[in-house]
Amino acid sequence: MSTVNELVNRVDETYDVLQIEKEIGLDNIALSDLELLATGGYSPLTGFLGKKDYDSVVETLRLANGSVWSIPITLPVTEEVAETLKVGEEVKLVNGGNVYGVIQIEDIFVPDKEKEALLVYKTTDEAHPGVKKLYERPNVYVGGAIVLTKRFENNPFPSYHLDPIETREEFKKRGWKTVVGFQTRNPVHRAHEYIQKSALEIVDGLFLNPLVGETKSDDIPADVRMESYEVLLQNYYPKDRVFLSVFPAAMRYAGPREAIFHALVRKNFGCTHFIVGRDHAGVGDYYGTYEAQEIFTNFTVEELGITPLFFEHSFYCTKCEAMASTKTCPHGKEDHVILSGTKVRELLRNGEIPPSTFSRKEVVEVLIKGLKKEVVTE
């Protein structure tokens, strides 16, 4: 493991993989993890977790060396594949017939998945999408340092797909000393906009970093979301104060733990601050509304290396005639229009147009067009 402030770089496209015979097939989650490990997005990790680090992360939200890390980044293989592997071997990492990297095997172990589910997701309920995915993936984990030997082709968002070293450079070029990161898997609605702009009042720049890796089936597709972010930024944000780039990771839906993970990753991308709103990275009713904020009290800002900014649930108040939160609005619930990505999705899928208090009209137009296309292709 590298030191906390150092950006890991394990990309080497000249690496000779021809002599390596054995291979491990990567699913989409492991493939996106491979890229983020190699480009420093997951610094200080240099590879998939071995047993010692895995146990430590699951039980204590820290690596074995004490560094804060809250989500186990693992490489699952089947029992059949595991039987062919040995510690000390170098093995190719493949997906769709392409070799994307290699792993130097340091560990092969069988995890206690029920324990992982309970501690990471706070539930063993298979209706939870993160738990479901955990149980679906193979049952043996392979740990070890990796090298990314081939960059991904057919990247759906090439102009927005930047490595941490590139986003850091971009912020520097813009003269931003303080940058706030915002994680989203939903189209940006008015409550998000209010929070982002409130944060923008106290920092130099906003880094809008939507997740475009694997998400659950009823989330709005990434290409539709990206178009919605583009029209929003074009029409309602100062161009020199906002930067848009994608986060290629898969969504874990691990609530509080994922909030810590998202903050650590944005630190690697160059952020000094990170927005944590209500039910960050949550799903259903598995986590408390502000549980993802409360978990940060277990860590100092120094050891995280990034400052979390906590925001209460915001809403449109018909009496204030403005976006507000309980901190700024004295009126009762009957005057509050509660906004959420789930509600916007629900309205759109029912063929209803969300009111302007929910979403900007340009965003709604993009979403309607995108969802019509989705219906046609289903």
From Swiss-Prot:
Keyword Cell inner membrane attributed: no
GO biological process, one term: sulfate assimilation
Catalytic activity: sulfate + ATP + H(+) = adenosine 5'-phosphosulfate + diphosphate
UniProt keyword Transferase present: yes
Keywords: ATP-binding, Nucleotide-binding, Nucleotidyltransferase, Transferase
Family as reported in the entry's similarity comment: Belongs to the sulfate adenylyltransferase family.
Listed NCBIfam families: PRK04149.1, sopT
HAMAP family to which the protein is assigned, alphabetical: Sulf_adenylyltr (MF_00066)
Designated name of the protein: Sulfate adenylyltransferase
